[in-house]
């Protein structure tokens, strides 16, 4: 695959976490630093989709959402609008267990025909760990204009590729949405 840009969707304040989600600490480090650590062996082209000054300590370009209050789809729209590469790795900011190996698998198995490539097990699809092609921007724009913001609805509209994973691999793709989920994660790892 030609050059790739990574965009981390930092979202905003999480009501369930009471703070910026990407800055929640896990093993003494913010979530976002775990994610960046997994990306760096692959590319240094990393940009953050956020308007928050709380991420200013990181040496990466920060891009505020072009459209507000449109959830992850708005973040992906912003990312692809600013991207200079055909292929883009889009990641949410709440996946501290993501590994370089899983990201490399995603990148190596992506085919040019697919507008989106994501992981899925029998029980769960992971749309916010994916390769997104810049060419699907018009489809995302239409979805936002129609207020059709569900990620699974977007997948249904776009030629996409699902990389099947075992149920046990879901663990590394887990997104942490609440303090309870973070506690569960810490217990599972101890």
Curated annotation (Swiss-Prot):
Its cofactor is Mg(2+). It is found in: Cytoplasm. Its EC number is 2.7.7.77. It catalyses: Mo-molybdopterin + GTP + H(+) = Mo-molybdopterin guanine dinucleotide + diphosphate. GO terms for biological process: Mo-molybdopterin cofactor biosynthetic process. Coiled coil: none annotated. Mg(2+) binds at residue 94. GTP binds at residues 9-11, 21, 65, 94. PANTHER family: MOLYBDENUM COFACTOR GUANYLYLTRANSFERASE (PTHR19136:SF81). This is Probable molybdenum cofactor guanylyltransferase.
């Amino acid at each position: 695959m030609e050059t790739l840009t990574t965009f981390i969707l930092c979202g905003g304040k999480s009501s369930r976490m009471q703070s910026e989600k990407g800055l929640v600490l896990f093993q003494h480090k913010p979530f976002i630093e775990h994610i960046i650590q997994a990306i760096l062996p692959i590319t240094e082209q990393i940009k953050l989709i956020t308007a928050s000054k709380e991420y200013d300590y990181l040496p990466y370009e920060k891009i505020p959402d072009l459209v507000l209050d449109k959830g992850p789809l708005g973040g992906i729209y912003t990312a692809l609008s600013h991207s200079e590469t055909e292929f883009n790795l889009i990641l949410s900011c709440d996946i501290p267990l993501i590994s370089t190996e899983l990201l490399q698998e995603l990148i190596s198995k992506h085919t040019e025909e697919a507008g989106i490539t994501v992981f899925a097990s029998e029980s769960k699809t992971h749309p916010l760990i994916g390769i997104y092609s810049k060419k699907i921007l018009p489809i995302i724009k239409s979805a936002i204009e129609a207020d059709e913001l569900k990620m699974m609805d977007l997948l249904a509209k776009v030629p996409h590729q699902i990389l099947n994973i075992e149920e046990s691999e879901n663990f590394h793709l887990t997104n942490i949405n609440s303090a309870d989920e973070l506690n569960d994660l810490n217990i599972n790892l101890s």
